Swiss-Prot record:
Binding site for 3-methyl-2-oxobutanoate: D67, S68, D106, K136
InterPro entries with a match to the protein in the record: Pantoate_hydroxy_MeTrfase, Pyrv/PenolPyrv_kinase-like_dom, Pyrv_kinase-like_dom_sf
One Pfam family in the UniProt entry: Pantoate_transf
GO biological process, one term: pantothenate biosynthetic process
Top-rank lineage group of the source organism: Bacteria
Species per Swiss-Prot/TrEMBL record: Mycobacterium leprae (strain TN)
Catalytic activity field: 3-methyl-2-oxobutanoate + (6R)-5,10-methylene-5,6,7,8-tetrahydrofolate + H2O = 2-dehydropantoate + (6S)-5,6,7,8-tetrahydrofolate
Binding site for Mg(2+): D67, D106, E138
Major subcellular location class: cytoplasm
Protein name, entry field: 3-methyl-2-oxobutanoate hydroxymethyltransferase
Record key words, sorted: Cytoplasm, Magnesium, Metal-binding, Pantothenate biosynthesis, Transferase
Gene name tied to this protein: panB
PANTHER family: 3-METHYL-2-OXOBUTANOATE HYDROXYMETHYLTRANSFERASE (PTHR20881:SF0)
Statement: the UniProt record of this protein carries the keyword Transmembrane helix: no
Length: 286
């Protein structure tokens, strides 16, 4: 299949059948091309084969196996406790379900901070054992050496600046970053990760005006989460996007469904039909 003739931007609005769309395996070069052409794109998290397959069929070009699995899969309060051993099986499942999407794996807290050697060791595990197509790590200037080391080794890196959840304790909670005098440092972080070789950068909880400035300054795609409309792409945790998360969601989240309500209703109906001997019916039996 010729890559010149494929749709790499997701679902084609002119057709009702996603299956009919000519698609190719998304590479980092496609994301760069989309930025150059002014095409915005969406990224979602995924943590298992089944949801990865659904999102891939929906035309989502990039799936992130985020360390947010700490919260939505393992039930931790923050992303800090989750380990590489806990994330690797999730990456394997997502890779199997994503026939076209680029799969990015988050490097967990503590696995890359010691330096380039440690970063290369853990990133290699996610590429070899997990099958990830790229990795993501948090931080700006302070992790530029790690990013340069990984890219030199042939490992694509997605950076993450602004609010970095792994640093929630040192940042004093969930707070917008880059306001006032901190804006200069946020810009410096963005430039540093780009110069180190990152193929894209997530900007989380950054003021819209600053995110717009950075997006115009960088040649690599910017991915916003609470960073306004002018980023090249957007990302959300899928449970937040689909209404499965418990408790209050962040201001930057838009819920597109009520999956929790649908699952609850389905489970209740199933339990009631079993209790009342309605299920299984004759058509479900041999």
């Amino acid at each position: 299949m010729s890559e010149q003739n494929v749709n790499v931007y997701g679902a084609d609005p002119s057709t009702s059948s996603i299956q009919s769309i000519q698609r190719t395996k998304i590479r980092t070069k496609h994301l760069q091309k989309m930025k150059a052409e002014g095409h915005k794109w969406a990224m979602l998290t995924a943590y298992d084969y089944s949801t990865a397959r659904v999102f891939d069929e929906a035309g989502i070009p990039v799936l992130l196996v985020g360390d947010s699995a700490a919260n939505v899969v393992y039930g931790y309060d923050t992303t800090v406790p989750v380990s590489a051993d806990e994330l690797l099986p999730l990456v394997r499942g997502v890779v199997r379900g994503a026939g076209h999407a680029l799969v990015v794996a988050d490097l967990p807290f503590g696995s890359y901070e010691p330096g380039p050697t440690a970063a290369l060791a853990v990133a290699t595990r996610f590429m070899k054992e997990g099958g990830a197509h790229a990795v993501k790590l948090e931080g700006g200037q302070r992790v530029a050496e790690q990013i340069a080391c990984l890219t030199a080794a042939g490992i694509p890196v997605m950076a993450h600046i602004g609010f970095t959840p792994q640093s929630v304790n040192s940042l004093g909670g969930f707070r917008v970053q880059g306001r006032g005098g901190d804006a200069e440092q946020t810009v410096a972080d963005a430039v540093a990760v780009a110069e180190a070789g990152a193929f894209s950068v997530v900007m989380e909880m950054v003021p819209t005006e600053l995110a717009t400035q950075i997006t115009g300054k960088l040649t690599i795609p910017t991915i916003g989460i609470g960073a306004g409309l002018n980023c090249d792409a957007q990302v959300l945790v899928w449970q937040d996007m689909a209404g499965l998360s418990s408790g209050k969601v962040a201001r930057f989240v838009k819920q597109y469904a009520d999956i929790a309500g649908e699952l609850r209703r389905a489970a209740m109906q199933y339990a009631e039909e079993v209790a009342s001997a309605v299920f299984p019916a004759e058509e479900h039996c041999f």
